C-alpha cells in the first residue's frame, strides 16, 4: 500500500483494508498515506514485522525491487506473485508510482479514493483492459478479490468468513 494522504472521505478505505488483512500476510507500505494506518501494532510473522514501512513516495521503488527479486527467485513474474498493490493518490508523486508500475507491466493495481482527474473515462477504460486497473470500492470485497486474483470466493469460504 502506498501513495498520498488526502482529506477525501474515501481515505478511510485504506485504514479499514489494513484491519481486514489476515494475520499471516505482510503489509509493505510507503508514502504519506501510511499515516492513516501505521500506528497500529500488526504483530509479527516468525519474527518479521507484518507492517514494513519503506519511507516516502520515492521509496516505493524499493518495494517494487523486492517484488521483482522475489519473482526472479521463484522463477515467475511479479503478476504471478500473491501480491496486491493499492495506491492512494492526490498529487504527481503518486502518479509517478502508478506510471512506474504500468511501465513494468504490473497488473491488477487498485487506485483511489477516486481516479486522478487526468484519467478520462476513455483512458481509464484502456488501462482497465490492458492492466486490470481498478478503482477501490468496498474493502471487504476488494480484499477478497486481491486474495483470489479473480477467482470467485463462495460466501461460505474461509476468507469470506474471515472478512465478515
Name the predicted role of every residue range.
Residues 1-164:
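Anaerobic metallocofactor- and corrinoid-dependent redox/one-carbon enzyme cores
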Amino acid at each position: 500500500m502506498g501513495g498520498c494522504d488526502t482529506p477525501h472521505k474515501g481515505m478511510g478505505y485504506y485504514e479499514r483494508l489494513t484491519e481486514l488483512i489476515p494475520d499471516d500476510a505482510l503489509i509493505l507500505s510507503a508514502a504519506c498515506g501510511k499515516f492513516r494506518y501505521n500506528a497500529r501494532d500488526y504483530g509479527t510473522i516468525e519474527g518479521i514485522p507484518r507492517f514494513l514501512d519503506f519511507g516516502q513516495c520515492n521509496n516505493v521503488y524499493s518495494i517494487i525491487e523486492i517484488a521483482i527479486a522475489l519473482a526472479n527467485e521463484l522463477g515467475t513474474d511479479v503478476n504471478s506473485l500473491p501480491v496486491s498493490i493499492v495506491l492512494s493518490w492526490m498529487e504527481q508523486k503518486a502518479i509517478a508510482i502508478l506510471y512506474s508500475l504500468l511501465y513494468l507491466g504490473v497488473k491488477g493495481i487498485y487506485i483511489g479514493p477516486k481516479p486522478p482527474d487526468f484519467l478520462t473515462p476513455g483512458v481509464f477504460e484502456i488501462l482497465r483492459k490492458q492492466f486490470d486497473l481498478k478503482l477501490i470500492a468496498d474493502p471487504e470485497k476488494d480484499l477478497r478479490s486481491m486474495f483470489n486474483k479473480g477467482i470467485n470466493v463462495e460466501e461460505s469460504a474461509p476468507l469470506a468468513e474471515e472478512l465478515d
